[in-house]
Amino acid sequence: MASSMLSSAAVVTSPAQATMVAPFTGLKSSASFPVTRKANNDITSITSNGGRVSCMKVWPPIGKKKFETLSYLPDLTDVELAKEVDYLLRNKWIPCVEFELEHGFVYREHGNTPGYYDGRYWTMWKLPLFGCTDSAQVLKEVEECKKEYPGAFIRIIGFDNTRQVQCISFIAYKPPSFTDA
C-alpha cells in the first residue's frame, strides 16, 4: 500500500508534466502580416449583393393584409402548393388543414395585446393528417374544405409533434369575394 501511495505522489510532482503545454502568451499582432488593399471604389467589384439591394422593390405595406408565411407573394398555384406540402412532409411535420370564415388575417378584436381571440386560431378541418406521405392527400382535403365552405380562408400548417410547435403555416385558398385592399 505504501508503494502505491509513493508512486502516485511521484507522478503528480513530476516536472515533465508541468512543461507539456506552453503557457498562453497573448494574441499576435496583425501588424506583422503583409496586407495589400485594392484601392478601387467601384461597387461592381464588391463580392456581396449590397449595391444591388437598393434597386429591389418590396411589397407595398399600405392597404395589404398580412396573412401567414409567404403572404407577400401572389396566390400559390396547385403545383406550388404541392411543393410546399412536400417540403412540410420531408421535414417530418404533420400537415393540418384549417379554415376561417370571417377573418383570414391577424386582427385585434378584444384589446390591442396578443391573445386567444386575435385571429391566430382557426377552426381545424377534420383531424391532422398523421401518417400522411403524399401532398395529394393534403390538397384533396383542401378541395373538400373549399366545397364545404367556399367563402372561407383555408390554410395549411405543419406541426412538429416532437417539439410540439407549429413550424409552417401558409394560405392555401382565399375566397373569391376577398380583396387585398
From Swiss-Prot:
Main location as per UniProt: plastid
Coiled coil: none
MF annotations from Gene Ontology: mRNA binding; protein domain specific binding; ribulose-bisphosphate carboxylase activity
GO CC entries: apoplast; chloroplast; chloroplast envelope; chloroplast stroma; plastid; thylakoid
Location within or outside the cell: Plastid, Chloroplast
Alphabetical GO biological process terms: photorespiration; reductive pentose-phosphate cycle
Keyword terms of this UniProt record: Calvin cycle, Carbon dioxide fixation, Chloroplast, Photorespiration, Photosynthesis, Plastid, Transit peptide
Top-rank taxon: Eukaryota
A Pfam cross-reference name: RbcS
Transit peptide: 1-54
Matching SMART domains: RuBisCO_small
PANTHER family for this protein: RIBULOSE BISPHOSPHATE CARBOXYLASE SMALL CHAIN 1, CHLOROPLASTIC, RIBULOSE BISPHOSPHATE CARBOXYLASE SMALL SUBUNIT 1A, CHLOROPLASTIC-RELATED
Complex formation: Heterohexadecamer of 8 large and 8 small subunits. Interacts with RBCX2.
Role noted for this protein: RuBisCO catalyzes two reactions: the carboxylation of D-ribulose 1,5-bisphosphate, the primary event in carbon dioxide fixation, as well as the oxidative fragmentation of the pentose substrate. Both reactions occur simultaneously and in competition at the same active site. Although the small subunit is not catalytic it is essential for maximal activity.
Additional information: There are four genes coding for RBS in Arabidopsis thaliana.
UniProt family annotation: Belongs to the RuBisCO small chain family.
Protein name, as recorded: Ribulose bisphosphate carboxylase small subunit 1B, chloroplastic
Organism: Arabidopsis thaliana
Lineage: Eukaryota, Viridiplantae, Streptophyta, Embryophyta, Tracheophyta
